[in-house]
């Protein structure tokens, strides 16, 4: 299966894809280069598909890839509930796409970066 090396070693590339995928799941949209966005789209689609499956094995596979970051902090009086990126994937993001089979993300081209003229894009989850 072909993939982009993105000018990095395999461990650096995997870490970058994990970070960008987690950020996309938490925030719903990220700004990055076109090549990175096309690779992150693949990993994000796989994570959302795991979220739709929802069984224990899918949770473990997603937990092995998605970073353990805080997605939301919900304060209700004295109670404080912290939602991780993995919980947000399974509780909020995956149910939004229950009726959709793939194609969970959209790439919108924006301006070129000033320093090196790299094409910047906005990668966002489809509504």
Swiss-Prot record:
One Gene Ontology term from the biological process aspect of the record: translation
The source's domain of life comes to Bacteria
Could you list this entry's UniProt keywords, alphabetically sorted.
Answer: Ribonucleoprotein, Ribosomal protein
User: One of this protein's Pfam families, by short name?
Assistant: Ribosomal_L17
Q: Does the keyword Transcription apply?
A: no
The reply to whether Cell wall biogenesis/degradation figures as a keyword in the UniProt entry is no
Q: Tell me, what is one Gene Ontology molecular-function annotation carried by this entry?
A: structural constituent of ribosome
Q: Name one GO cellular component term.
A: cytosolic large ribosomal subunit
Q: Which PANTHER family match?
A: LARGE RIBOSOMAL SUBUNIT PROTEIN BL17M, RIBOSOMAL PROTEIN L17
Q: Which family does it belong to?
A: Belongs to the bacterial ribosomal protein bL17 family.
Query: Subunit comment for this entry?
Result: Part of the 50S ribosomal subunit. Contacts protein L32.
**Name of this chain's protein:** Large ribosomal subunit protein bL17
> Per the UniProt entry, what species is this protein from, by scientific name?
Leuconostoc citreum (strain KM20)
Q: What is the lineage of its organism?
A: Bacteria, Bacillati, Bacillota, Bacilli, Lactobacillales
């Amino acid at each position: 299966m072909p993939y982009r090396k993105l000018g990095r070693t395999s461990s650096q590339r995997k870490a970058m894809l994990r970070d960008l995928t987690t950020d996309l799941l938490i925030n719903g949209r990220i700004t990055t280069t076109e090549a990175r966005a096309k690779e992150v789209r693949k990993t994000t689609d796989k994570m959302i598909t795991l979220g739709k499956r929802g069984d224990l094995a899918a949770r473990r596979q997603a937990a092995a890839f998605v970073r353990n970051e805080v997605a939301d902090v919900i304060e209700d009086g004295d109670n404080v509930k912290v939602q991780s990126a993995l919980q947000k994937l399974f509780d909020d993001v995956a149910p939004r796409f229950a009726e959709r089979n793939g194609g969970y993300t959209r790439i919108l081209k924006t301006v070129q970066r000033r320093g090196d003229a790299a094409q910047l894009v906005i990668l966002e989850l489809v509504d």
